[in-house]
């Protein structure tokens, strides 16, 4: 990379970004801080919306058969698993896309792509002849939203000095992760809103005697996505980053710590994301008498809120290993007790154990990052 120069007062934004040097205190105070914070705000909002889209299917799946579809339990759970599978698989690829295409460019492209499954799903759920194969393609496309996390986290930290990078990443990932709670909280209101259905021209399904506007849960994200795309063009930037070395990428697979952390992250965040996606279907199957939609957001909200606490506690006792170990032991215990709650057909006990599972996942995920 060429030698960086100190921009002059009145320098263009393009010139400032081309000479990005956040570890230079003078540069940071005069030029860097404002631009970095603008990028962080837009990145965080975009990531929050991506998480909303990633869990969009989970809010609709439990209602499909009531709306006139005829999918088996196995098919519904398979569809619920696809967004997580695709998102997790593509995170490795997405991590390197900002360096290859530019952070602003890739954030724009990866967010723009999300409009495809959002619009398509809105029409698909209104047509009961939509095939299982079509829904498989749709849920796979929804999974792209989950991969946005890795590119967002890999890129936004480059704007900040090391002393502030942890806070920036915590805001970006922590707030973004709350998108799961946002979609679970808003979707029931949207699906029950005739006014919103009229705006979008949605045909309601009659489920248990009530008009349910399933497509609203998808269509309501069109405007926020378009707005954030417009803001990206004004307030995000492409930092000059070194292109990834393929040789270094291959070496990652030979590092035993990579595999150990991958396993731990699978057990922590994987458990969280998987259970959050499947919980609505599980309740619908085992406790059909429970109106679960109104409280579905609680577990993901708890996990998201406790994620930074897990990192803080790890720093406090200077051991992410201990926090992770205790959290995973708790996770195993609560998972077993969830099964007990199902066997007993005791929803309060089942739900309490589910929330404790999310508590353990939140602590474990934060500690694993540490």
Per-range role (PLM):
Residues 2-46, 50:
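Cytosolic juxtamembrane N-terminal segment immediately preceding the first transmembrane helix
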Residues 38-69, 275-280:
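Extracytoplasmic
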Residues 57-62, 256-308, 369:
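Extracytoplasmic gate region of multi-pass secondary transporters
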Residues 90-103, 306-319:
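Helix-to-loop junctions at the C-terminal end of transmembrane segments
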Residues 100-111, 315-329:
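Cytoplasmic membrane-interface "Motif A"-like loop-to-helix N-cap segments
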Residues 146, 166-192:
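Glycine-rich segments within core transmembrane alpha-helices of 12-TM secondary carriers
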Residues 222-242:
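C-terminal membrane-cytosol helix-exit motif in multi-pass small-molecule transporters
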Residues 320-368:
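C-terminal transmembrane helical hairpin of 12-TM major facilitator-type secondary transporters
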């Amino acid at each position: 990379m060429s030698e960086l120069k100190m921009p002059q007062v009145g320098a263009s934004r393009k010139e400032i970004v081309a000479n990005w040097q956040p570890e230079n205190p003078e540069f940071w105070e005069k030029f860097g801080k404002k631009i970095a914070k603008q990028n962080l705000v837009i990145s965080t909002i975009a990531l929050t919306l991506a998480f909303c889209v990633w869990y969009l299917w989970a809010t609709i799946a439990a209602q499909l058969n009531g709306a006139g579809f005829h999918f088996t339990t196995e098919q519904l759970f398979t569809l619920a698993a696809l967004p997580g599978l695709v998102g997790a698989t593509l995170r490795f690829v997405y991590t390197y896309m900002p360096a290859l295409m530019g952070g602003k460019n890739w954030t724009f492209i990866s967010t723009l792509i999300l409009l495809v499954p959002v619009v398509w799903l809105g029409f698909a759920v209104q047509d009961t002849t939509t095939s299982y194969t079509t829904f498989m393609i749709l849920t796979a496309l929804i999974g792209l939203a989950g991969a946005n996390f890795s590119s967002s986290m890999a890129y936004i930290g480059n704007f900040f000095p090391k002393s502030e990078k942890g806070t920036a990443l915590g805001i970006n990932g922590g707030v973004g992760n709350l998108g799961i709670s946002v979609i679970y909280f808003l979707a029931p209101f949207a699906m029950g809103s005739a006014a919103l259905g009229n705006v979008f021209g949605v045909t309601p399904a009659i489920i248990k005697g009530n008009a349910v506007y399933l497509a609203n849960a998808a269509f309501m994200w069109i405007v926020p996505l378009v707005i954030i795309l417009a803001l990206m063009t004004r307030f995000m930037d492409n930092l000059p980053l070194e292109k990834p070395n393929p040789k270094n990428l291959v070496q990652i697979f030979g590092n035993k710590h990579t595999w150990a952390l991958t396993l731990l992250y699978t057990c922590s965040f994987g458990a969280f994301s998987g259970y959050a996606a499947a919980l609505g279907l599980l309740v619908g199957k085992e406790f059909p008498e429970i109106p679960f939609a109104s409280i579905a957001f609680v577990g993901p909200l708890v996990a998201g809120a406790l994620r930074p606490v897990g990192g803080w506690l790890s720093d406090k006792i200077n051991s992410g290993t201990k926090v992770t170990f205790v959290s995973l032991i708790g996770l195993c215990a609560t998972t077993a007790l969830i099964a007990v709650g199902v066997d007993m057909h005791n929803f309060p006990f089942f739900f309490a154990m589910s929330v404790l599972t999310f508590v353990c996942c939140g602590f474990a995920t934060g500690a694993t990052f540490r």
